[in-house]
């Protein structure tokens, strides 16, 4: 064992200060990066929702698979301290690479605001995420155990309080990061053009991880550093493998059956190890249904965040970003854990109900299932507010009069009269085969026929400004703007080209009496500048939008005033989101309550039922259930392809209820044990065996005393 001089502070080893600060910074780094990851995939890399969800959950699964590797390295090779330092360096590099991958100007050679070589960003992102998964997962089983190693015998009370402080540091880091990094994301930054500031939002977590590493290394001289004692997981695997191989080797009836399949390892392994593995496998068997809970729980960062992008973030005077809704879980967990421990559980006990650990976990599954039912109800309400878009062989038309004359528009079954600078109330839907001709006219003028080839499944805007002057514009917006952003396009009624710059994005060379394509912006007031060679120098070229909310689309008409200066008129194409993000709070509340009675209880149950030297084995098994849960999401998201998102939520809720019933049946037949008593019995037996070997008269003397 590597020892250093012990320093204490109020009875606690001073070294744990460095470990707690390290954990706070590391959790800030991890959860801060993870909070914005799904929106980075959809907004910056432009993956669709299903692929983004799949990559997100693949990453999370890797983060919970690599703890096994970290435990192996620490126990059999480097020890906990060197493992934490080595993998923290890998972790920091991964965060830095991810931040670099999000720099738009890295490949934006033509300075148009979009990457010219998206594969470069994708490859860098995946390399960064792989390094992060190796780093965060590898140190996960080491840091808390290393903190526990710092205490002396007789400091059990301080050690227990340390784990409470450690858990608080985790939640504090998670809470702050999920508030701060989304705020950094919505800032505008860039060298040649301005975009959502992902480099800063990823860069701050990278800096915090570097701080975590530095703080941890600074405490090096105060730590107790135990040398690797051999990997118990390897011994467990070898014993199980030998038992299975030996059992199949003696399949014939000539060999008598043994009480337990692990008893076939007795030829090579001692009774104590076999008994300990039996305890572990009994708990591991109960772990089989548990991944389904995590399949639902970890969708907070994917599906639920994407759901929030279709909602309004205005809550009173506050404006909540979609990825900030995850802070609700972190806030509620800090509130609910003490309420459950100090109020709810004692109240249940006073009522005479034996609320065992496994019963609590089953209740947690039910609560998580209910949370997804609530999420489905919220999704149905969201779907009701969505505009109707053309399907199949349908086409939608909106007419916008950008001239100074009253115009009459004749469509199949529709006759519309529009005054100057006005539009139809909504998009009109037609069968594409029947929309062969649109007639436009004004009082005293001949009729002009519009016979353009309207593309099926598309929205079109018919710009008219005189009886024989029109322009058909394909909108290119056949769904609500994604990620809660707002679509803006401009129509030029000048007789010359104009260029408009808005928040770093350029609408270049919009031709006369034509429309630009939509560009997309986050919520807020956006400034824009109109430039043209024909605008007099005394004119004010700078304008502001009104306040953009979430998920809207607008057409801005640029027209000339009597003094030849430009002015702007606005028409709504798609209304803003109206279902408020606050409606997600009930589903977060139910899921958080489920987490308290499932996750916290599950860890306590695993610890209490594990032999002293195999608690790390069960910890690795517990983390493995999280990884498998994320793999389940991958399978469902990849294979389901539901046309309605609420249906996927209901499927997950139903699957978890079925799994809960199976788990309840399995738990019914589980017998709680006290590993300490079993190990004490082995200690007593081994002590007797040693006495027998050293004193052959030990048993005979004892027997003679019994006879006296």
Swiss-Prot record:
Region (Extracellular domain (ECD)) spans which residues? 383-584
- Extract the coiled-coil ranges from the record: none
Asked if the Swiss-Prot or TrEMBL record annotates the protein with the keyword Cell membrane, the reply is: yes
GO annotation terms (biological process) = dipeptide import across plasma membrane; monoatomic ion transport; protein transport; tripeptide import across plasma membrane
Subcellular localization is given as: Apical cell membrane
Mutation: residue 594 to A; reported impact is: Does not affect peptide transporter activity
Topological domain ranges for the Cytoplasmic compartment: 75-82, 140-161, 220-276, 349-361, 606-619, 667-708
What happens after mutating residue 594 to C? Answer: Nearly abolished peptide transporter activity
Q: In which tissues is it expressed?
A: Expressed in small intestine.
Domain of life of the organism encoding this protein: Eukaryota
This protein's UniProt keywords: Cell membrane, Glycoprotein, Membrane, Peptide transport, Protein transport, Symport, Transmembrane, Transmembrane helix, Transport
Q: What is the effect of changing residue 573 to A?
A: Does not affect peptide transporter activity
UniProt-recorded Gene Ontology molecular function terms? dipeptide transmembrane transporter activity; peptide:proton symporter activity; proton-dependent oligopeptide secondary active transmembrane transporter activity; tripeptide transmembrane transporter activity
Ranges that cross the membrane: 1-21, 54-74, 83-103, 119-139, 162-182, 199-219, 277-297, 328-348, 362-382, 585-605, 620-640, 646-666
Family according to the record: Belongs to the major facilitator superfamily. Proton-dependent oligopeptide transporter (POT/PTR) (TC 2.A.17) family.
Describe the function of this protein.
Answer: Electrogenic proton-coupled amino-acid transporter that transports oligopeptides of 2 to 4 amino acids with a preference for dipeptides. Transports neutral and monovalently charged peptides with a proton to peptide stoichiometry of 1:1 or 2:1. Primarily responsible for the absorption of dietary di- and tripeptides from the small intestinal lumen. Mediates transepithelial transport of muramyl and N-formylated bacterial dipeptides contributing to recognition of pathogenic bacteria by the mucosal immune system.
About its domains, the entry says: The extracellular domain (ECD) region specifically binds trypsin.
Q: What is this protein called?
A: Solute carrier family 15 member 1
Originating species: Homo sapiens
């Amino acid at each position: 064992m590597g020892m250093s001089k012990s320093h204490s502070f109020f009875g606690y080893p001073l070294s744990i200060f460095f470990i707690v600060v390290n954990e706070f910074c590391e959790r800030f780094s991890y959860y801060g990066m993870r909070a914005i990851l799904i929106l980075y995939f959809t907004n910056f890399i432009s993956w669709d929702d299903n692929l983004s969800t799949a990559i997100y959950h693949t990453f999370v699964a890797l983060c919970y698979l690599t703890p096994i590797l970290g435990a192996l390295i620490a126990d059999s090779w480097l020890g906990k301290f060197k493992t934490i330092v080595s993998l923290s360096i890998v972790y920091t590099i991964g965060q830095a690479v991810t931040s670099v991958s999000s720099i738009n100007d890295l490949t934006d050679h033509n300075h148009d605001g979009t990457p010219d070589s998206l594969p470069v960003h994708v490859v860098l992102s995946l390399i960064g995420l792989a390094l992060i998964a190796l780093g965060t997962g590898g140190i996960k089983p080491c840091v808390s155990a290393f903190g526990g190693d710092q205490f002396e015998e007789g400091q059990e009370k301080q050690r227990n309080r340390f784990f409470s402080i450690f858990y608080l540091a985790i939640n504090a880091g998670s809470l702050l990061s999920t508030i701060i990094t989304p705020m950094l994301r919505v800032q505008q930054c860039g060298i040649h053009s301005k975009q959502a500031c992902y480099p800063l939002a990823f860069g701050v977590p990278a800096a915090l991880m570097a701080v975590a590493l530095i703080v941890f290394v600074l405490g090096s001289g105060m730590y107790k550093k135990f040398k690797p004692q051999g990997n118990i997981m390897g011994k467990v695997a070898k014993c199980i493998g030998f038992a299975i191989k030996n059992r199949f080797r003696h399949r014939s009836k000539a060999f008598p059956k043994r009480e337990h399949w692990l008893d076939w390892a007795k030829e090579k392994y001692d009774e104590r190890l076999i008994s300990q593995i039996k305890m572990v496998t009994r708990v591991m068997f109960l772990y089989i249904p548990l991944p389904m809970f995590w399949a639902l729980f970890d969708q907070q960062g994917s599906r639920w965040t994407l759901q929030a992008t279709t909602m309004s973030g205005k809550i009173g005077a506050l404006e909540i970003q979609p990825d900030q809704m995850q802070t609700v879980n972190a806030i509620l967990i800090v509130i609910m854990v003490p309420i459950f421990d100090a109020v709810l559980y004692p109240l249940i006990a006073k009522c005479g109900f034996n609320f065992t650990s496994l019963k609590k976990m089953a209740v947690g599954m039910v609560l998580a299932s209910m949370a997804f039912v609530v999420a489905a109800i919220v999704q149905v309400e969201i779907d009701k507010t969505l505009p109707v878009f053309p399907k199949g062989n349908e086409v939608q038309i909106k007419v916008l009069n950008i001239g100074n004359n009253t115009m009459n528009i004749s469509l199949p079954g529709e006759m519309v009269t529009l005054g100057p600078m006005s539009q139809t109330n909504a998009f009109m839907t037609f069968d594409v085969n029947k929309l062969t001709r649109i007639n436009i006219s004004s009082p005293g003028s001949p009729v002009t026929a519009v016979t353009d080839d309207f593309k099926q499944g598309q929205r079109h805007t018919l710009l008219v400004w005189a009886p024989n002057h029109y322009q058909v514009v394909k909108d290119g917006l056949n769904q609500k703007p994604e990620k809660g952003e707002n679509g803006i396009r401009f129509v030029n009624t000048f007789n010359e080209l104009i260029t408009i710059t808005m928040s770093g994005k350029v609408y270049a060379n919009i031709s006369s009496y034509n429309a630009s394509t939509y560009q997309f912006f986050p919520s807020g007031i956006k400034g824009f500048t109109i430039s043209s060679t024909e605008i007099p120098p005394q004119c004010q070229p700078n304008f502001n939008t009104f306040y953009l909310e979430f998920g809207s689309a607008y057409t801005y008409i640029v027209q000339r005033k009597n003094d030849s200066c430009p002015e702007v008129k606005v028409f709504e194409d798609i209304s803003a989101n109206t279902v408020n993000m606050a409606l997600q709070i009930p589903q977060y509340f139910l899921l958080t309550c489920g987490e308290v009675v499932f996750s916290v209880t599950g860890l306590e149950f695993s610890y209490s039922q594990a032999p002293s030297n195999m608690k790390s084995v069960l910890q690795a098994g517990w983390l493995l259930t999280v990884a498998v849960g994320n793999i389940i999401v991958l399978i469902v998201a990849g294979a389901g392809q539901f046309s309605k998102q609420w249906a996927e939520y209901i499927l997950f809720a139903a699957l978890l209820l079925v799994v809960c019933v199976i788990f309840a049946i399995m738990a019914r037949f589980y017998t709680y044990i006290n590993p300490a008593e079993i190990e004490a019995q082995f200690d007593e037996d081994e002590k007797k065996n040693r006495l027998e070997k050293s004193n052959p008269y030990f048993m005979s003397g004892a027997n003679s005393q019994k006879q006296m």
